[in-house]
Amino acid sequence: MSDLPIINFINFNQNGTCISIGTSQGFKIFNCEPFGRFYQDDEGGCGIVEMLFSTSLLAVVGMGENPAMSPRRLRMLNTKRHSVICEVTFPTTILSIKMNKTRLAVLLQEQIYIYDISNMRLLHTIETSMNAQGLMSMSPNSENNYLVYPSPPKVINSEIKDHATTNNINIKKSDAAEDPLRKDHFAYDPSDHSHPQSTTESTSNNHNRTYSSGNNNNTNSNPNKIIKNGDVIVFNLQTLQPTMVIEAHKGEIAALKLSADGTLLATASEKGTIIRVFNVENGSKVYQFRRGTYSTKISSLSFSKDNQFLAVCSSSKTVHIFKLGEKIIDNTKPNELNSDDDMDDDLLPQFENGDDEEEVDEETLDEEATSLNSSHSNKEPIVDSSRSTVGRMIRKSSQRLSRKAAKTLGAYFPIKVSSILEPSRHFASLKISTTTNQPIKAIAAIDDPISLNTNEYPDLFDTSNQADHQNTDGLKMIPVRVLSSEGYMYKYILDPERGGDCILLEQYSLLSE
């Protein structure tokens, strides 16, 4: 096991049909169905290996073991011809690369370079704030050609001290307090960057343009200022202009993802308890989901191709799958919805005990959550017997009582308050099969529905409980593939009607020869 290479990068291609993996020895490309490796290069450590759908074009960035594999150098490769198409060197380390059929975006710590992928001509440069996590998502659809990335921190003036509560706030007597309408009390402060301004400059070289996102380096100079860094910028890759800023969360963005058609944006904050989905066209919040009670690190978000499901991978080795059937939030008033949508993160209890986090994430759907997410189905959710524990049964009973109480109280409160009490839970979940106790990173891809012959898996399916199905040989299931940072690909199946626990069908190693 000690001879196995170290994994530096792992990802699906844009439609989830292939896998690219970068290691300390080189990189590999795999086909998902049927599973198998079809390309390998062992010329040096790779930190980024991005595919363009199922084509022979690869974007590769090295780990710096030699000058040719510098982490500042982007190499565009043709795997069929085994040749280098072009190389581009950047001033700092490349953190992320995203591609579709018309655009290529290269993310550095404080810049994003946008290229025409057909000729690698530089079209635009975006100056943004520090993005050490390399967060960026590009729509695979060239018609809704969008790029999203975290907005620079927004500074909000506040005279409320940290940890202040309604029990110990004292109103300070001052001239401004006695006369709150004094002109200088609301006067414009040029040093206030609560509304970042964008500037566009034109240069004569290849018509390149630079957009500044309003980076503010003095956000911590005033201790009475509140820093809000949960906004997301939506950038149109066709017009090369930002279209809007979506106020996604109060805390720092931990993960974001555009849907395959570029119409939806999913976001998660560093707390990892609330997942939100926005309409990219108007910025309205159309879905809000509760992943769990305890804080955890969200490693990735993934939409299904038809936007019916959203997979959320966390460091607790659990993947939650939410159903996006009917909109749970009325988006007829987008401004009102987004004005205080951070309330949920503040009012929900937050914990940081990583040991308990894993137990909470293992919860199954209770009756109320099942009726919400699968209102058109009277069948019980699937329960994986291998995940049945006494603790899980106790948590399920406790959650049922809590949900009933929230439902009763919600009837007496406005919609916004009741949505905080009873946010939508996951439709299905799976637990990554691993023996390590260390947190892992994972990414999921939800495939198109397939017809599964349950007779081929007698140990996984109890056909005696499937009297509703006249033909058990053609059970409709949805494959869910999960990549782990340990170097495994797992293939689970999801029942699109019943939800519940996803069943593990296959498991492959991406490192073994």
Swiss-Prot record:
WD repeats lie at residues 2-40, 248-288, 293-332. It is a peripheral membrane protein. GO terms for biological process: autophagy; protein transport. Residues 167-225, 333-398 are annotated as: Disordered. Pfam families: PROPPIN. Keywords: Autophagy, Endosome, Membrane, Protein transport, Repeat, Transport, Vacuole, WD repeat. SMART domains: WD40. One of its GO terms (cellular component) is vacuolar membrane. Transmembrane segments: none annotated. It is found in: Preautophagosomal structure membrane; Vacuole membrane; Endosome membrane. Residues 338-369 have a biased composition (Acidic residues). The keyword Cell division does not apply. It comes from the Eukaryota. Residues 289-292 are annotated as: Necessary for proper localization to vacuole membrane. Disruption phenotype: Still forms preautophagosomal structures (PAS) in proximity to the vacuolar membrane. Residues 205-225 have a biased composition (Low complexity). InterPro entries: PROPPIN, WD40/YVTN_repeat-like_dom_sf, WD40_repeat_dom_sf, WD40_rpt. The 377 first amino acids might form a beta-propeller domain involved in specific binding to phosphatidylinositol 3,5-bisphosphate (PIP2), leading to the association of the protein to the membrane. Association to the membrane can also occur through binding to phosphatidylinositol 3-monophosphate (PI3P). The L/FRRG motif is essential for the cytoplasm to vacuole transport (Cvt) pathway, for the recruitment of ATG8 and ATG16 to the PAS in nutrient-rich medium, and for its recruitment to and dissociation from the PAS under starvation conditions. Belongs to the WD repeat PROPPIN family. Component of the PI(3,5)P2 regulatory complex. Interacts with ATG2 and ATG9. The ATG2-ATG18 complex is essential for autophagosome formation. Kluyveromyces marxianus proteins are shorter in length and have a more ordered secondary structure than their S.cerevisiae counterparts, which might contribute to the superior thermotolerance and solubility. K.marxianus could be therefore useful as a new model organism for further elucidation of the molecular details of autophagy. This is Autophagy-related protein 18. It comes from Kluyveromyces marxianus (strain DMKU3-1042 / BCC 29191 / NBRC 104275).
